[in-house]
């Protein structure tokens, strides 16, 4: 049940607090504009929310947030675990300013073995199903592809698409170099291939020694039967496997699946390094950098805000979570997780946020090795409940796990140092550009730059790109592509006019509507919508082009009533060499040649190159799609479903063109008469 406080009534904390129940749930704080400030959970909503307004020793950040609260909403849940799950979903959806946020990375790669009678080994991203076998997740695409190469070398499983597999008449190059047993042409029986698939799966699950022993027995059996050629093939397989195991000897431990989480804070930023061990193999790591840490609350459950008499209980509860299956000397006290207590650190809060946002809704390994004790005592229980198996946290590991944690902490420090260095250089470049262009900006982090580029191939598949630079970095989530239509092919000026009009016309209309609403209601000052529209307008608009392109942009901005001083063209220098560009202005200022050593020009070139990359990749994809599908789309009697069946059956347009009438007629939904018609239209 959700209980919102009406937005049109004065905010009276005492009245609201008196109505709150002593039940678990989630609370949300809003400011006067309706923006979400903070989302939290509680075992007891009344005591938790009341603590924000009754405590006198609030930190400056918490006190600042409390002064901005204009509305409170609460949702009662059946349990605290349910509240934790709802809190996580709301944080991801609403991105409150005072919550620690991690990028929602749901696209971890997996290694997939398909359910085909000759299973295919493939790189995969997306949701998993029960039909196929999935191994992972892996921390990077490189880790998956490395594993695929290992399995190709040792077990020679196929990697080709089913459409290619079904249409091969002779082995491919991978068979010739010993990377595939060519099941497509019957070079291996289904039973023998199934054995290789089983061995590959056990290898990925960390049962390498078991696979090696079975291969050795198989080799001796072949030799005893005087099948020396088969025995030699198994020997070579064992040799390849032994080489792989030797190369990974440092990485292989006794654990099957373990995640290592190291949190490091420095220079006002925090890094979480996640290292993954799958099947006993250390697959690498990935660094995460949360946002809103500088304004996030240092409030752990059981800390400042929960029931006072429950603080000690919260601190004492976490050590009662033993770690199962400790075979490397982690036993005793080291196998338990210490409670965070009332004084939860920033690292503990960040770890809480990461575990909640990363694992809830995703696969969880049975063991998490952590550098800090998490602040929430309920997190472990919820993870175990969701995963369907016990999830253990190890705070003070020993042996191989200790080495893994130390390495993760070191990598977190390195990644954080690199980030701080890059941020420093980016901030210097932003400052240099603002000074060069004479911009007055109190907070350089709010400086917003948008850059436009046009891309096409001899007038074909024209696309415009818009990339955004904000908060000292490229904001890929705000990139946009625009399909350009209704112009003369190859007319870059018309394309630029169209994209600028489409981009900024809506913003101007929104601001005008908000201003009209203010006038009608008698409200003094900008409305929220008008403020939002104004905040989206950039401080600088970069145009990839010279005087002609800038003149078109000036005309569009004049028609829309926008300030033309923000328009800057980036004219390429002699030979298109970086550092020789000239900045061209729409308001009549003298063009600038900054030189290749200029920090301002480095930033301009970085943004311009990103706009070009984004435009050209979109244009190529659009062109390829048009060329691949255009001929099939023109076929009479062939709709989307039949076209999809043809492409799946023959592996692409080239295969459809090469197919005979009989082969075309063998496709489901294609009659012999239609097959003849298709054949005639394609030849």
UniProtKB/Swiss-Prot annotation:
It holds the Pfam family UvrC_RNaseH. GO terms for cellular component: cytoplasm; excinuclease repair complex. InterPro entries: GIY-YIG_endonuc, GIY-YIG_endonuc_sf, GIY-YIG_UvrC_Cho, Hlx-hairpin-Hlx_DNA-bd_motif, RuvA_2-like, UVR_dom, UVR_dom_sf, UvrABC_protein_C. Keywords: Cytoplasm, DNA damage, DNA excision, DNA repair, Excision nuclease, SOS response. CDD domains: GIY-YIG_UvrC_Cho. One of its GO terms (biological process) is nucleotide-excision repair. One of its GO terms (molecular function) is DNA binding. It comes from the Bacteria. Residues 22-100 form the GIY-YIG domain. Residues 209-244 form the UVR domain. It is found in: Cytoplasm. Its main location: cytoplasm. SUPFAM superfamilies: C-terminal UvrC-binding domain of UvrB, GIY-YIG endonuclease, RuvA domain 2-like. The UvrABC repair system catalyzes the recognition and processing of DNA lesions. UvrC both incises the 5' and 3' sides of the lesion. The N-terminal half is responsible for the 3' incision and the C-terminal half is responsible for the 5' incision. Belongs to the UvrC family. Interacts with UvrB in an incision complex. PANTHER family: UVRABC SYSTEM PROTEIN C (PTHR30562:SF1), UVRC/OXIDOREDUCTASE (PTHR30562). NCBIfam families: PRK00558.1-5, uvrC. This is UvrABC system protein C. It comes from Burkholderia vietnamiensis (strain G4 / LMG 22486) (Burkholderia cepacia (strain R1808)). The lineage of its organism: Bacteria, Pseudomonadati, Pseudomonadota, Betaproteobacteria, Burkholderiales.
């Amino acid at each position: 049940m959700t209980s919102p406080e009406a937005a049109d009534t004065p905010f009276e904390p005492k009245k609201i607090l008196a109505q709150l129940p002593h039940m678990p749930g989630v609370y949300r704080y809003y400011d006067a504009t309706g923006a979400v400030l903070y989302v939290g959970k509680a075992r007891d909503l009344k005591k938790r929310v009341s603590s924000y307004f009754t405590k006198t020793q609030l930190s400056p950040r918490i006190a600042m947030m409390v002064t901005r609260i204009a509305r409170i909403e609460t949702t009662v849940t059946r349990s605290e675990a349910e509240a934790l799950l709802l809190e996580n979903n709301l944080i991801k959806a609403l991105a409150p300013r005072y919550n620690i946020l991690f990028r929602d990375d749901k696209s971890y790669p997996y290694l997939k073995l398909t359910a085909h009678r000759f299973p295919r080994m493939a790189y995969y991203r997306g949701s998993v199903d029960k039909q196929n076998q999935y191994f992972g997740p892996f921390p990077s695409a490189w880790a998956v592809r490395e594993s695929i190469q290992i399995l190709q070398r040792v077990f020679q499983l196929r990697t080709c698409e089913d459409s290619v597999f079904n249409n091969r008449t002779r082995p491919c190059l991978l068979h010739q170099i010993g990377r595939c047993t060519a099941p497509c042409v019957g070079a291996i029986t289904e039973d023998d291939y199934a054995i290789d698939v089983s061995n590959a799966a056990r290898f990925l699950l960390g049962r390498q020694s078991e696979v090696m022993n079975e291969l050795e027995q198989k080799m001796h059996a072949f030799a005893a039967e005087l099948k020396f050629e088969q025995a030699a093939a198994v020997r070579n397989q064992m040799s390849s496997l032994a080489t792989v195991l030797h190369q990974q000897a440092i990485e292989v431990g006794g654990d099957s699946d373990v995640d290592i989480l190291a949190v490091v804070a420095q220079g006002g930023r925090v890094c979480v390094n996640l290292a993954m061990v799958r099947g006993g193999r250390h697959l690498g790591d990935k660094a995460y950098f949360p946002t809103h840490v500088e304004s996030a609350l240092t409030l752990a459950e059981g800390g400042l805000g929960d029931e006072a008499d429950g603080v000690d209980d919260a601190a004492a509860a976490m050590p009662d979570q033993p770690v199962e299956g400790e075979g490397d000397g982690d036993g005793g006290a080291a196998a338990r997780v210490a409670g965070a207590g009332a004084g939860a650190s920033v690292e503990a809060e960040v770890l809480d946020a990461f575990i909640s946002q990363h694992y809830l809704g995703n696969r969880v390994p049975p063991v998490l090795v952590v550098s800090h004790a998490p602040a929430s005592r309920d997190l472990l229980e919820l993870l175990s409940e969701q995963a369907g198996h016990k999830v253990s946290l190890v705070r003070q590991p020993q042996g191989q796990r200790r080495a893994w944690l130390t390495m993760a902490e070191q990598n977190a420090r390195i990644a954080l140092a690199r980030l701080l260095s890059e941020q420093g250089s980016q901030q210097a470049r932003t400052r240099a550009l603002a000074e060069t262009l004479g911009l007055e900006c109190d907070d350089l982090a709010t400086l917003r730059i948008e850059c436009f580029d046009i891309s096409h191939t001899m007038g074909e598949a024209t696309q415009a790109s818009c990339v955004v630079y904000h908060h000292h970095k490229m904001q890929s989530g705000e990139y946009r592509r625009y399909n350009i239509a209704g112009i003369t092919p190859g007319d870059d000026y018309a394309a630029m006019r169209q994209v600028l009009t489409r981009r900024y016309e809506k913003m101007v209309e929104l601001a005008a509507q908000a201003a009209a609403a203010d006038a009608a209601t008698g409200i003094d000052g900008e409305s929220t919508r008008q403020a939002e529209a104004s905040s989206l307008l950039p401080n600088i608009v970069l145009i990839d082009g010279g005087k002609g392109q800038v003149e078109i942009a000036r005309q569009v901005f004049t028609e829309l009533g926008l300030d033309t001083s923000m328009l800057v063209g980036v004219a390429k220098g002699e030979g298109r060499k970086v550092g020789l560009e000239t900045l061209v202005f729409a308001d009549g200022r003298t063009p600038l040649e900054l030189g290749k050593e200029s920090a301002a020009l480095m930033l301009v070139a970085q943004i311009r190159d990103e706009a070009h990359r984004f435009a050209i990749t979109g244009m190529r994809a659009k062109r390829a799609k048009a060329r691949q599908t255009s001929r099939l789309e023109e076929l009479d009697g062939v709709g989307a479903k039949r076209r999809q069946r043809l492409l799946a059956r023959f592996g692409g347009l080239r295969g459809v063109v090469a197919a005979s009438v009989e082969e075309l007629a063998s496709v489901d939904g294609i009659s012999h008469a239609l097959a003849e018609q298709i054949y005639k239209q394609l030849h």
